Amino acid sequence: MAFRRAEGTSMIQALAMTVAEIPVFLYTTFGQSAFSQLRLTPGLRKVLFATALGTVALALAAHQLKRRRRRKKQVGPEMGGEQLGTVPLPILLARKVPSVKKGYSSRRVQSPSSKSNDTLSGISSIEPSKHSGSSHSVASMMAVNSSSPTAACSGLWDARGMEESLTTSDGNAESLYMQGMELFEEALQKWEQALSVGQRGDSGSTPMPRDGLRNPETASEPLSEPESQRKEFAEKLESLLHRAYHLQEEFGSTFPADSMLLDLERTLMLPLTEGSLRLRADDEDSLTSEDSFFSATELFESLQTGDYPIPLSRPAAAYEEALQLVKEGRVPCRTLRTELLGCYSDQDFLAKLHCVRQAFEGLLEDKSNQLFFGKVGRQMVTGLMTKAEKSPKGFLESYEEMLSYALRPETWATTRLELEGRGVVCMSFFDIVLDFILMDAFEDLENPPASVLAVLRNRWLSDSFKETALATACWSVLKAKRRLLMVPDGFISHFYSVSEHVSPVLAFGFLGPKPQLAEVCAFFKHQIVQYLRDMFDLDNVRYTSLPALADDILQLSRRRSEILLGYLGVPAASSAGVNGALPRENGPLGELQ
């Protein structure tokens, strides 16, 4: 090989020297007189230089092609002796080595029977991890790319050495231990899935008793060879899982499945159930049962708060009666606000909602309470519009007209029909004012149309233009909705008249570019939501009886209105003699802000 390289370089040098001597030969042959008479233009010089350079390039290319042809002729006889079906040993080793799942950075516990996120888990197993330095993948790539077995074997050992150096420099022993435990957990999950799939196949392929009665000859036949192999594999897998569980208990697992339910029960102060006591027992007795292979996801799904009594810090007779009505399906609701109001479950929310409805019904039978809630609503919106530097005159006129219409008994039947068409299932103060008007308005402001956001986020438009455009959009929407009303002069029509003054202010406050107005609107929303959360909290109000709950809601309303109106700079609606303190047996309200 060295002789060939020397021969090739000598030929290249001879060719280059020959081309370089051409100008010298021409000069010595024709003499200086001929070249002195010949004048070369710059263009002709470029042509001559390009011609010489191209000639050299063609010569080099031809020489290189000759060398490749010689190599193919020499390699052909050597490869002819090998069999086509054989594969080099390093490639087989690299393929036979089981590759560990690399996506261990995202830890999750999955049930073998659950079908959710199977596609995602497959993608994550294909995708290389950030910290992946697996010697198997590196070795397989080097073995396939290498042309000789010795080079592949050396690449395998080099890859292992590279992995060891990378892992030792990547983190300390503790982090490596955690990574190993995570990979061990993932291996356990895969083994559990394999066992569950095998058990499903066995259950699907087992003959029925009536089939054995019909065909006694076939029933008495021994198991076929594939079935016996499957059974033997399942037994080996069970023993492997049994050893793996004991190994996990010995060294401690990152996600103990048995203690998770017990810790959750201690947190919620729930009594120990039969399932939790069974999980406390040794796994040897229940190794072949499906309970051994429950994942943490199934444990959380099986633990539903509605199946257990909710922990009560004090007696709540009214709440317990309402909870019984909820279980019977006698408490309707338009929209579930379980998460927003911090309830344990939907049943908990519906039971408290039933009590709150009845409490407001008893409160509003008193004329003074009607005046109080009407005055508080008027003052809150007036203070909000004053903070936004808007005149509240038009709002006050529309608000008084809506109140006078709503307080007339002859309009209640029409109002009920209108609100039932909007999904309101109960004619209570909570369902109409707090839920249908306020909470729906906050939800609409959280998801504004894209066209409105495009105008408000345009840097080239002034704030006044944005405010005018937003107000025009609100008015046009309300005008279009007014045309579709079932009752042209009903409660919804009066509500739209109020919204024409309030909606642009709220929309520009929540979505506009003014930070001071946005802070005021955010505080307004926070107080309303916190007022409802306190109302649905067993520790802040008494659910012992409906009169006690009504009294606590009234005191809570006075306290919250004082906080909000004081922030807006408006005198409080409550008199000086009422300070909003709750009775002693109810406990302190604490800081409500």
UniProtKB/Swiss-Prot annotation:
Phosphorylation at Ser-295 of the FFAT motif activates interaction with MOSPD2, VAPA and VAPB. The modification Phosphoserine is found at S132, S220, S224, S228, S276, S295. Pfam families: Miga. GO terms for cellular component: mitochondrial outer membrane; mitochondrion; plasma membrane. The chain crosses the membrane at residues 11-31, 42-62. GO terms for biological process: bone development; mitochondrial fusion. GO terms for molecular function: protein heterodimerization activity; protein homodimerization activity. Belongs to the mitoguardin family. This is Mitoguardin 2. It comes from Homo sapiens (Human). The gene is MIGA2.
